[in-house]
């Protein structure tokens, strides 16, 4: 996400960013992590663009135990903003990746940090936040794995970003339906653009996410994410997919993200280019 003042923020890179050398990144000022599950923290990444198939990408470059996120932050000398108890864990990972632990900044619920001109707040999410054994020291990781456990890093979070042009973006992270989506995200922060997960089973599904948008957050527009499917073909949404079901259920303009396309929004949450 890029502010008009040039501040650039990366959110939950997971598997999808090809390390700090990914040419799509450019300058990165801060990295956000909603929770420490592998698909957000990143145990591996693709060696080249589009490696593998859309439904089965190839992640040949291993990033454990440090994580793709920590490697990117260290390589870009970017801040990491994190809530709960994730900051101490991430500080160790950044140090191991060659960075400075002081790059990691804690942002608890109710606070707002600044990165350049962008305000960054954490908001509650309803999910889990266990970090997998592959990210831990071998002895501890093996012990947890043998007992079917993960290391808990406290509550997961979502984010609200306040940009200098007036745009206020809600990044849901992985979550179910929460009262805070109304009380905190809509009433207090007045988010006018939302990026919401629609993956179902583990998080809100298409109809639940549409309810969150239409009845709780009430933004001017929404971007569906984390659908856990091959959602598009030839730039068009595939009929019958979760993405298709969400697009039909929600009542505000919904913009599907496509590789290689940049979307631009004005201060009211209206898409003005790339949608």
Predicted region positions:
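Binuclear metal-ion centers of metallo-dependent hydrolases, dominated by the metallo-beta-lactamase
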Residues: 72-113, 211-275
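Active-site metal-binding motif and surrounding structural segment of the metallo-beta-lactamase
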Residues: 6-9, 14-82, 89, 96-100, ...
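Short, solvent-exposed loop/turn and secondary-structure capping segments
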Residues: 44-46, 133, 206-207
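Acidic-and-aromatic substrate-binding clefts and catalytic sites of carbohydrate-active enzymes
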Residues: 200-206, 231-234
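Active-site metal-binding loops of divalent metal-dependent hydrolases
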Residues: 13-15, 36, 85, 125-126, ...
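Conserved strand-to-helix beginnings and helix N-cap segments that scaffold or border functional pockets
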Residues: 181-182, 206-207, 235-237
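Core dinuclear metal-dependent hydrolase active-site scaffold
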Residues: 1-24, 106-186, 264-275
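Divalent metal-coordination and catalytic microenvironments
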Residues: 1, 12, 35, 43, ...
